[in-house]
Structures are given as C-alpha cells and as structure tokens.
Curated annotation (Swiss-Prot):
<keyword id="KW-0067">ATP-binding</keyword>
<dbReference type="InterPro" id="IPR029047">
    <property type="entry name" value="HSP70_peptide-bd_sf"/>
</dbReference>
<dbReference type="InterPro" id="IPR043129">
    <property type="entry name" value="ATPase_NBD"/>
</dbReference>
<feature type="modified residue" description="Phosphothreonine; by autocatalysis">
    <location>
        <position position="173"/>
    </location>
</feature>
<dbReference type="InterPro" id="IPR018181">
    <property type="entry name" value="Heat_shock_70_CS"/>
</dbReference>
<dbReference type="InterPro" id="IPR013126">
    <property type="entry name" value="Hsp_70_fam"/>
</dbReference>
<keyword id="KW-0547">Nucleotide-binding</keyword>
<comment type="similarity">
    <text>Belongs to the heat shock protein 70 family.</text>
</comment>
<dbReference type="GO" id="GO:0005524">
    <property type="term" value="F:ATP binding"/>
</dbReference>
<dbReference type="GO" id="GO:0051082">
    <property type="term" value="F:unfolded protein binding"/>
</dbReference>
<keyword id="KW-0346">Stress response</keyword>
<dbReference type="Pfam" id="PF00012">
    <property type="entry name" value="HSP70"/>
</dbReference>
<protein>
    <recommendedName>
        <fullName>Chaperone protein DnaK</fullName>
    </recommendedName>
</protein>
<dbReference type="GO" id="GO:0140662">
    <property type="term" value="F:ATP-dependent protein folding chaperone"/>
</dbReference>
<feature type="compositionally biased region" description="Low complexity">
    <location>
        <begin position="576"/>
        <end position="590"/>
    </location>
</feature>
<keyword id="KW-0143">Chaperone</keyword>
<feature type="region of interest" description="Disordered">
    <location>
        <begin position="576"/>
        <end position="609"/>
    </location>
</feature>
C-alpha cells in the first residue's frame, strides 16, 4: 500500500510528515525548513507558496495569509485578478506540501490524513476535505489536532495508563482535549475550544499598540496603509517570538510612511511586561475551555497525569504560566509544539495502512447536533463529546393537521434556540399522508462518520418513504465546483513544472555560453582552429535561439554547442597531456645526463717531494 502522509494544515504554518518504519518523520521543505508558512502569493501568473510567498508579502498585494480562518465560510479572497474560495487557497498549500513530500519519498502521493482544530464544525471539516480533493489527495481521515498530538506523544507509552490534557494554541484556533491512554487505546473524553483565538490575535494586540503610539506621536494612522500594515504584522510576529526568549525587544521600521516634512520611521521598544499587559484578556480566554473540558470529562485536576503543549503560541511565557496556574502542573515539553500534530497525523496514516499495530483512536464530536422543532427550539440528538463514529435516532411528528411535508433543519451548537446555532443544512420529507397533527411518525437519524462529517436521514414510518442527505453547508462546494478546481490545480501544477523546466533550461544555456566563451578565449593561437571555429559557430547559433526565446530551438542548439565544446575540450586535454609528457621526458633526460657526468673526471697524480 502506498504511503499515507500526515498533514498539519495550520493557520500560520503547515507541516507534513511520513511514517518510516515505526517512526514518524517530518519532511523538510525545499528551503530546508521543517514547517512551511501557510502563505500563498501570485506574481506574473505564477503561484508561490510558503517561505518565498511570505518574504514578498510586504511588497506583493496579491498575497493571502491565514486562509484557515475562512474555511467553512462563503467568503472569497481577491487576488491575481480573480476570486478564490478558501478551499482553493488551502489546496495550493496542500499541493505544495504534497509536492515536496513526493520529492522526498521518490514516489507519487495520493493519500493523506489531514488535521483540523477539534472545535471545527461540520462545514469547516467538509471544506478541509474538499481542499484535499482539489489538491489531488484522497483524504483518508480528518483527525482533530489535539488527538493527533496525543498520538505522537503516547505511541511509545501504550503500556501505561494515563490521562492527559492537550492544550493546543495555534496561529488562529485554540483547543483543549482530555484523553485517556492505555493498552493502545487513545480515548478522547472531552474537547472544548475557541475557533477565534490564536497567535494572530496576539500579533494584532502588538499591531494595535504600535499603530496607536505612532498616531499619538505623528498624527498618522498606519492602519490605513496596506503596505505599512504588512510590515507591522511581520514586526509584531517577530517581536512576539523575541519576547519568548528575552524581556525586551526593539521594533525598528525605517521609512514606514511619509509626513509633510518627509519620511517617517517607527522606532519603539516593547517589554515582555507590556506585551503581557496587552494580551492579558487573550490569556484569560484560554482558561474557560480548560475548565469546560475538565467538567465535560467529569475529571478533577488531580486526575490529570500530564499536560501537553501544542502550537507555536504555547511558547509565550504568559501562556505557559497560565497553564501552570490553571492545571497546577508543569507542562510536559517532550514534544515539539510545531511538529507534533503532523507527526501524529502520519501515525494515524500508519494505523490505516496497518504499519502501526494495536492502536485504536476514539475521537469525539466537539458540538451537539440536532434539529429545529416547534417554536424554534433546538432539540439535540447527539450531545457534544459523544465518541465517533456514532448514530442516533429519534421519532418526531407533524405540527399541524394534514401536514403534507416536514422541513428538517439540521443544526450544530449548544444554545437552546435554533436561531443561535450553526445551520448545517435543510431538507424536506414530502408526501406524508393526510392525518391529524401528532399522528405521523417521522424518524430522524443522525450519523457522524470517523471524520466528524454528518449525514441525516428522515423516514416516514407509516409509508417507509425516506430522504437522506450528507450535510453540505450553504458555504460548501458542489461536486462540479470541486471537479473544476481539481482540473485548475492540475493545470497549475503542470504550468509550474513547465515554468521550472524553462528556467532550468535558460540557466543551462547561460552557463554553456559563459563556459564556451571562456574556453574559446583561452585556446586562441593554440593551433586547433577547426574545433574553435565549430564551437564559435554553435555558440552564435545558440545565442540567436536564446534571443528568439524558442525553447525547443534553444534545447537543440544547446545540445549542438555541448557537442562542439566537448570536441574542443578533448583537443585542449590532448594538447595539455602531450605537453606534460614532453616535459616529463625532458626532465628524465636531464636527470640521466647529470648521473653520467662522472665518466669525464680525470684522476690527478700527487708526487711528494
């Protein structure tokens, strides 16, 4: 069975891992980094992903960041003169990760396990699966990020029973999951979270502070300047990271804008104490889901054996201190918070292929599911933190006499009124026989699969007629749209490969021209004019092809030049070898002469008087 890669598709950074033997290994990107910025930019018709895209974010307005925060919505992003869905942008990131995983493995990759925040709703999960499909990946499993982290942490501890709390604060989302580990079973007891809390919010607090201070000093609002804002974002992210290791950092942004008197510079120092003060409310918000998860799991703090920190934002000292204060435990630092989720996803891939034995993953649904009933009430059929996959049925009836149809309004959430929860979809069961209200028996069945994706069935028990739908939110993509986007993604991949081939050829041509010109110059007057003239002719032909830009012609002329240049090089080598041989012969003769010179010596006679 082909390898199943594990992908952590993050808000700020993404990572890809693969199982090698029994070990999960992070695959470095082409720049040698173990995580890849979740950034996509467009330039001259080219799609740029990762580090290169992030580097040009300041100067390129066609750059998209933090797209994960828009997953599961109908919001589109404008770039490159087009509008893209969040699924399409995410697919570009996935395609890039897939590409360098294939380079590393030396084989095609078609299957993946992709992680999502535990608190992602059905629409967001479906959007993630669609993004994988567009990228040419069969998504074998959607796994919750804290659960994946627990897999990576606990794989070598399957003989030990313990309860762990996973505190996962990423770039844009926050989750807390409580799991019980033992005998190879990873059982999620409860999960809670906040999909609108992450490292981006900490960055924003610094940005707001810098904007306010600069406005106070210079009377100019930098938040209205897109380029300045991107520079502020980069500086804020760097300052946040710096303050995890030092107590004070300098923020220096020369020529940030211009005033009436000329260019203005932003120079400010930010202390860790000030940063903690700015972000205090965000740190406080992390405490509520911790308490909620413990309550839902029915556990006290004393029953938690380990606290695992996941996500780059857990490096913030105030966050670490808050976790210590809230749990009464020193966090376990045995896992890399940036890499552990992708590693866990790869392990789950190994479970699917059978390479990892005796491991069972029991995940839960993060939010309650149900339907709208009379009076706009939300009636739950499946409670949050129910182990998945699961199925639950309940019988309902009509609200009016002779009602011919019932509308099934499917919802996800925790609020008592339907209007306050997230609509997953609507469908209708028709042709109900005329009868007084309360008589028809309508059975509604909810199914949640292992990926947390919902399907709903309504059945008239009297006529046995039923209606069944897999929930596709109003913000989701149709099969036709996914198909079109897949073709676009494939076309882009082909175009990118062709563009790379073109660049490589042009570089090869430049190198060949430079090397041949150097050789021709060095061989002037050395006696092999035939080969030099042939190389010069081939060189001139290649230069003409280079000017025309015809790739096929360039390729043909490059081969011709290489042949002539090779012939010239052979002649040079032969001449050099002959000269070396002649020199060696001359030196040998000289040595022989000096050895024989003793034969001409005449002995003199000495007479004593």
């Amino acid at each position: 069975m082909s390898k199943i890669i594990g992908i952590d598709l993050g808000t700020t950074n993404s990572a890809v891992a693969v199982l090698e033997g029994t070990e999960s290994k992070i695959i470095a990107n082409p720049e040698g980094n173990r995580t890849t910025p979740s950034v996509v930019s467009f330039k001259n018709g080219e799609i740029i992903v990762g580090d290169a895209a992030k580097r040009q974010a300041v100067t390129n307005p066609d750059t998209v960041i933090s797209i994960k925060s828009k997953m599961g919505t109908s919001e589109k992003v404008a770039a490159n003169g087009k509008e893209y869905t969040p699924q399409e942008i995410s697919a570009m990131i996935l395609q890039y990760l897939k590409g360098y995983a294939e380079d590393y493995l030396g084989e095609k990759v078609t299957k993946a396990v992709i992680t999502v925040p535990a608190y992602f709703n059905d629409a967001q999960r479906q959007a993630t699966k669609d993004a994988g499909k567009i990228a040419g990946l069969e998504v074998e499993r959607i796994v919750n990020e804290p659960t994946a982290a627990a897999l990576a942490y606990g794989l070598d501890k399957t003989d030990k029973e313990e309860k762990i709390l996973v505190f996962d604060l990423g770039g844009g989302t926050f989750d807390v999951s409580i799991l019980e580990l033992g005998d190879g079973v990873f059982d999620v007891l409860a999960t809670a979270g906040d999909n609108k809390l992450g490292g981006d919010d900490f960055d924003q607090k610094i940005i707001d502070f810098l904007v306010a201070e600069f406005k106070k000093e210079n009377g100019i609002d930098l938040s209205q300047d897109k380029m300045a804002l991107q520079r502020l974002k980069d500086a804020a992210e760097k300052a946040k990271k710096d303050l995890s290791g030092v107590t004070q950092t300098q923020i220096s942004l020369p020529f940030i804008t211009a005033g009436a008197a000329g260019p203005l510079h932003l120079e400010m120092s930010l202390s860790r104490a000030k940063f903690d003060d700015l972000t205090r409310d965000l740190v406080e918000r992390t405490k509520v889901p911790v308490r909620q998860a413990l309550s839902d799991a029915g556990l006290s703090l004393s029953e938690i054996d380990e606290v695992i920190l996941v996500g780059g934002s857990t490096r913030i000292p105030a966050v670490v201190e808050a976790v210590k204060a809230e749990t009464g435990k020193e966090p376990n630092k045995s896992v890399n918070p940036d890499e552990v989720v992708a590693m866990g996803a790869a392990i789950q891939g190994g479970v699917i292929t059978g390479d990892v034995k005796d491991v069972v993953l029991l995940d839960v649904t993060p939010l309650s599911l149900g339907i709208e009933t009379m009076g706009g009430v939300f009636t739950k059929l499946i409670d949050r933190n129910t182990t998945i996959p699961t199925s639950k049925s309940q019988v309902f009836s009509t609200a009016a006499d002779n009602q011919p149809a019932v509308d099934i309004h499917v919802l996800q959430g925790e609020r008592p009124m339907a209007a306050d929860n997230k609509t997953l979809g609507r469908f209708q069961l028709t042709d109900i026989p005329a009868a007084p209200r309360g008589i028809p028996q309508i059975e509604v069945t909810f199914d949640i699969d292992k990926n947390g994706i919902v399907s709903v069935k309504a059945k008239d028990l009297g006529t046995q007629k039923e209606q069944h739908i897999v929930i596709k939110s109003n913000d989701g993509l149709s099969e036709e749209e996914i198909e079109r986007m897949m073709k676009d993604a494939e076309a882009n991949a082909e175009a990118d490969a062709k563009r790379k081939e073109e660049v490589d050829l042009k570089n090869e041509v430049d190198q060949a021209i430079f090397a041949t010109e150097k050789t021709i110059k060095e061989t002037e007057g050395k006696g092999f004019d035939t080969e030099r003239d042939a190389a010069q002719t081939a060189l001139d032909e290649l230069k003409k092809a280079q000017e025309s830009g015809d790739l096929d012609d360039m390729k043909a002329k490059l081969e011709a030049l290489n042949e002539k240049a090779q012939a010239l090089a052979v002649k040079m080598y032969e001449q050099a070898a002959a000269a070396q041989q002649a020199q060696a012969g001359a030196e040998g003769a000289a040595d022989t002469g000096s050895t024989n010179s003793g034969d001409d010596v005449v002995d003199g006679e000495f007479t004593e008087k």
